[in-house]
Amino acid sequence: MTTNPKPVYQRILLKLSGEALQGEEGFGIDPATLDRMAQEVKELIELGVQVGVVIGGGNLFRGAGLAEAGMNRVVGDHMGMLATVMNGLAMRDALHRAYVNARVMSAIPLKGVCDDYNWADAIAQLRQGRVVIFSAGTGNPFFTTDSAACLRGIEIEADVVLKATKVDGVFTADPVSNPDAELYDKLSYSSVLEKELKVMDLAAFTLARDHNMPIRVFNMNKPGALRRVVMGETEGTLISNAE
């Protein structure tokens, strides 16, 4: 395997699930996991890659149970958005402790806590080598953080959306329940839809497809995987318009 001397991506949008931050814990934020992820992002900054981040909120708030109990979906989604802001603040703090400049931008105004999302400002920050953490999803209920990741990725003209998961990429079947499941190296948008593979929700996926935004799914729990993806090594599954 030949290693490229420099990164194949100049600007990326990294999507982290909230659950990824909880480590082995069942809830909340695991400090060691948070620091490890901050170090992996720091490596990319040192390579000259511009990094935007979207983090989910599932480690702090899960609306499904409350929705079943009768909570209004809009209220639940607003609570979920605030959970992503909390994760964003934690990630910014971890990056600052690793001597990496980072800004948190929120799609809903939270004066005194973080910056309001502003497209031009986000681009300027990225160009200055700062990590920009986009929080509060899209700012609208009924949209997932995967949708927010694809939307922000398209807006900042990222080269790729990197979706960090607990498995090595996209498989023919669930690798947890089916040990014979095979890992796909590359997929087209159409084949993902045809095979009904669960990469992300349909709204997010079709947004990426319609704007020709490549998605790479990889395992963030694998040390060095993020760097390997950015350096163009074989890691995870690439989804693009190429058949």
UniProtKB/Swiss-Prot annotation:
Reaction catalyzed: UMP + ATP = UDP + ADP
First-level EC class: transferase
Cellular component, GO, one term: cytosol
Keywords: Allosteric enzyme, ATP-binding, Cytoplasm, Kinase, Nucleotide-binding, Pyrimidine biosynthesis, Transferase
GO biological process: 'de novo' CTP biosynthetic process; UDP biosynthetic process
Pathway per the UniProt entry: Pyrimidine metabolism; CTP biosynthesis via de novo pathway; UDP from UMP (UMPK route): step 1/1
Coiled coil: none
Record text on activity regulation: Allosterically activated by GTP. Inhibited by UTP.
Binding site for UMP: G57, D77, T138, G139, N140, P141, F142, F143, T144, T145
Sequence segments annotated as region (Involved in allosteric activation by GTP): 23-28
GO terms assigned for molecular function: ATP binding; UMP kinase activity
EC number(s) on file: 2.7.4.22
Matches recorded under Pfam families: AA_kinase (PF00696)
UniProt-listed InterPro entries: AceGlu_kinase-like_sf, Asp/Glu/Uridylate_kinase, Uridylate_kinase, Uridylate_kinase_bac
Transmembrane portions of the chain: none
Subunit structure: Homohexamer.
Family: Belongs to the UMP kinase family.
HAMAP family, alphabetized: PyrH_B (MF_01220_B)
Protein name: Uridylate kinase
Species this protein is from: Aliivibrio fischeri (strain ATCC 700601 / ES114)
Lineage summary: Bacteria, Pseudomonadati, Pseudomonadota, Gammaproteobacteria, Vibrionales
